[in-house]
Curated annotation (Swiss-Prot):
Keywords: Cytoplasm, DNA damage, DNA repair, DNA replication, DNA-directed DNA polymerase, Nucleotidyltransferase, Transferase. It catalyses: DNA(n) + a 2'-deoxyribonucleoside 5'-triphosphate = DNA(n+1) + diphosphate. One of its GO terms (biological process) is DNA replication. The lineage of its organism: Bacteria, Pseudomonadati, Pseudomonadota, Betaproteobacteria, Rhodocyclales. It is found in: Cytoplasm. It comes from Dechloromonas aromatica (strain RCB). Its EC number is 2.7.7.7. Belongs to the DNA polymerase type-C family. DnaE2 subfamily. It holds the Pfam family DNA_pol3_finger. GO terms for molecular function: 3'-5' exonuclease activity; DNA-directed DNA polymerase activity. DNA polymerase involved in damage-induced mutagenesis and translesion synthesis (TLS). It is not the major replicative DNA polymerase. This is Error-prone DNA polymerase. The gene is dnaE2. It comes from the Bacteria. CDD domains: DnaE_OBF, PHP_PolIIIA_DnaE2. One of its GO terms (cellular component) is cytoplasm.
Amino acid sequence: MSLPEYAELHCLSNFSFLRGASHPEELAARALAQGYAALALTDECSLAGVVRAHLAAKKHGLKFIVGSEMMTVDGLKLVFLACNRHGYGNLSALITLARRRAEKGGYTLHRNDLESISPSGALPDCLVLWVPGNNPSSADGEWLVSRFPGRSWIAVELHAGPEDAERLAGLQSLGEVCGLPLVATGDVHMHIKARRPVQDVLTALRLKSTVFEAGYALFPNGERHLRSRLRLSRLYPPELLAETLNIAARCEFLLDELRYEYPEEIIPSGETPASWLRSETERGLQRRYPAGVPGSVRERIEHELGLIAEMAYEAYFLTVYDIVCYARSQDILCQGRGSAANSAVCYALGVTEVDPARSALLFERFVSKERGEPPDIDVDFEHERREDVIQYIYTKYGRERAALAAALITYRTKGALRDAGRALGFGIAQINALTASLAWWDKREQLPERFAELGLDPHAPRVEKWLAIAEALRGFPRHLTQHVGGFVISRGPLSRLVPVENAAMSARSVIQWDKDDLDAMGLMKVDILALGMLSAIRRMLQIVGETTGRPMKMQDIPAEDPATYEMLCHADSMGVFQVESRAQMAMLPRLRPQNFYDLVVEVALVRPGPIQGDMVHPYLKRRQGRERIEEISPAVDAVLERTYGVPIFQEQVMQLAVVAANFTPGEADQLRRAMAAWKRKGGLEPFEQKLLAGMAANDLPESFARRIIAQIQGFGEYGFPESHAASFALLVYASAWLKRHHPAAFLCGLLNSQPMGFYSPSMLIQDARRHGVRVLPPDVMTSDWDSRLDERGAVRLGLREISGFSVAAAKRITAVCRENQPFLNVADLAARAGLQRRDLDLLAAGDALQGLAGHRRQAAWAATVAVVQGDLFDGTPVVEAEIELPAPSDGENLVADYRSLGLTLRSHPLSLLRQYLAERRFVTAADLKMAGHHTLIRSVGIVVGRQRPGTATGIVFVTLEDETGLSNVVVHPQLVEKQRRELLGSTLLGVYGQLQVEGEVVHLVAKRLVDLSAWLGRLETVSRDFH
């Protein structure tokens, strides 16, 4: 017998969070495999998964229908399907309405909302399926018919239960009474039946119970999957299956019909986007080139403006320009980066600070006709003032037309294990022990080993189920959050383009699509990003201006300062933007930067792309004159001249494709995109053949062509654009110059911009002290909230360094202290600044009351007395007989410093243990630098950082600190696994190993690790670990 045609019209994906158990792509592929005529994705009050489903259906040639399931507050469950573009806009607006009136994650829908969306009736151009409950009311059906005449149905959902026949008969009678036709739907929650255990776990998690406690809340069987048409034909009358095709035929909308329109109010009356962009670009050129615009720049500007006009992107550039102008008007440091720095127009407008004409950067890396996608401009703002910029956008365009893009939070290994374990009834102690035992680099195949280490048999059925479900959950959407700064701004109501909902943060809204969805749909996104170093540099410059009496801006920093480069050549770069990592510090003495372009290369070279493409060593050897630079052809040599014949940047690969293999600039950009995705998706093969053929046609050696292809593959998704590296290099140089010439201001700026960077405040302070900076502890009599320079140039730490102390209390203290006479004692401080017991206790613990009460114990006593006096005598000062308490020991003070401040200005903890350590032949970090290559040696230090880069083939790099500085430890994979507990769990780590010395770069290669944390007693320190 022939199988009936069928279209699934009620289907949830895992974007119905904690309900659906399959990805949209899985559903589309399965629907095709089952021979379905169409598939509707109808996630609950959401269109978050529709772009993924649309792309998958398009790839498979499957008809895709956009819809959503929603329930009114009085329990009416409806599925809406969009017929056309207008219907889609109405559905999107309805979802927005329901979401915006509820807290994040929820929605509230009333029946009359269906009529409020459009003046022309209830949700025009949408079809409605009513999913009745167990005791449906004919009144609900009659209401539906009256509001949606000719476009409403009763959804019949049969799941092979004993009551199916009775339910079908009841719904047929209901349909006759109400005048509603019936249609078969599946209430699909998974693409295959095997996902049922995952769906059960999701249900239990949603209900905050275990699978065993969930009971009847779980589905009775696994029928809510995309069933075969044979199976459906045995459950449903033929006419109900045929009706699915009639409904699907009425749903003609495709997501490809969406068209984005740029905002227009940034364009003055009487101007067009093209004329205004040209006018502002001309103004910018006069500012950038006061001595006259070079002919090459003028030619480049005309080329860019022509391509921008052809692609109709003028309004996009002007929108970003307007945002940057606002930031500059408010003295907010900002700087464009990424591929936007390839644009001379962006440089003229002041959006970016890198002159692309000087570096011959390719505009097609940014805007390409062949790519046909809107450009993507990333702008970094001071992280503490970015909210001002965000609120400017909301104020200018309104929350109806501006919203942040979503970011999709998915399950990772630890979260998947934790949630699966909870739902399956494992104990919290077991779950915590397991997740705590995992390192960030543990692979899936290592999980059974971790289970076994905790005494759990990985082959026991219950544990196997835990592992299997956790594995299935990895990569599952958990919830939507807001993107770090990607804004979507539209000309009309944004809600008719994509649903908008409230963000967790007040005064913010977020769309239901993430950046990948936006890229796929060609919607404009402006990235308003936060960069801590911009905040730090602005603070540093402000302090320098205050101390010198001359206001200073970034453009006032002298260019090409030899002392700054000399400092970087010695890897003295702690706290310096982008070159403070272990890998960068190891590279600096080898590369020895002498000018700004060297910094551009430095930023790009220590990246997975050049490392995996085997470009680092050839570059360094050729730079140092130890390897000959191969001459290929004049055109090729010109592209690679500045990088010694080695392609370091994405733009160079694109230029090589153009000059060596006859690619067009647009084709070269397509090559770049294929490079970025080939490890995940493949797709480089056609480009390889074209490269080989093109280079052969130009008589270039095949060996050179093969080497370039191998390097392209090495680049993978990690190749660095020169434009991006140049933008970052500006901040590298500025921060390095400030560290070299104004180290105290540099330290203040970093401390006042935390959290940021690789290093903790403790390490930054230790480094500054090694550079001669005097650092003073927090003091309630002299400290502000922020750290600052005193009249002698010393850094006075701010009250922000005291853990748990509030900025409000600090501001009250500084306000009272400045307006009136200094505080007399702790009771006077409490009374005049309105401090509570907790405030005083925190100040005493942070040793910030020393000027008023003496050492910590005395201060804690004074705080207690002040509170008692305030309670008994209503704040009236009372003379209290002084009680002399013994001062804490050095060790007790160290413990208290780290507990309260996370740092100490007293002796380093290891200086107190040095004699004990020396007796056991543990040498200092300074001693390591004096020893020779291959020396067998032992050292010890407080663990301040662990890193395991993806390019390091399993090697873990550990940074240890002692009283003389930092030491770098290399732990190879075999030792990582053998001594993972010591590696991951030690606060004080002893290392027996062998020195590896290359010039100024010294590494201790570990042979054995020893956990010596017990020697620190109660001292609490924190390591900063990075993937």
